[in-house]
Regions:
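Acidic/glycine-rich phosphate/pyrophosphate-binding loops and surrounding catalytic core
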Residues: 2-146
Length: 146
């Protein structure tokens, strides 16, 4: 993952206020551990799984996230794309940021895949351009390529 992406993830965590999650900090013991799974809700294409992993790494390097489906993989509802294990408090603090990246990027990848399929057999080609959401270009362009 390039430096720009790592810095943008750091900024996203700051913006989300992960260090000020008073609900989690007050209700979840710092010793409580959690094991969980990322389960697909709709047929699509995985994108951003590496970004989600980096989110948790930045919060706590002790969080273990095993990627079961790589970026660019077609998935169906109910598929498990990753598992996660670590301090519950830290996983909950990063959950929203990780899922936001994962959902946005997977949505872009799935939509791109549909257009690529529609254009199969023609001379047309899907390109990723500079027309992206502010500050998200590095992630959105990756999603198109996935």
């Amino acid at each position: 993952m390039d430096k720009k992406a790592i810095e943008l993830i750091k900024e996203a965590l700051i913006e989300d206020g992960v260090d000020n999650d008073i609900t989690t900090l007050n209700l979840v013991s710092k010793d409580k551990m959690l094991t969980g799974s990322f389960i697909v809700k709709a047929t699509g294409v995985v994108s951003g799984i590496d970004v989600a992993k980096e989110v948790f790494k930045q919060i706590n390097p002790r969080i273990k996230m095993e990627i079961l489906k790589a970026n660019g993989t077609f998935v169906n509802r109910g598929d498990v794309i990753a598992t996660i294990e670590g301090p519950m408090r830290d996983i909950l603090r990063g959950e929203r940021v990780a899922l936001n990246f994962l959902q946005r990027m997977s949505g872009i990848a799935a939509t791109t895949a549909k257009f690529v399929q529609e254009l199969a057999g023609t001379n047309c080609k899907i390109l990723d351009t500079r027309k992206t959401a502010p500050l998200l270009r590095v992630f959105e362009r990756q999603a198109v390529r996935d």
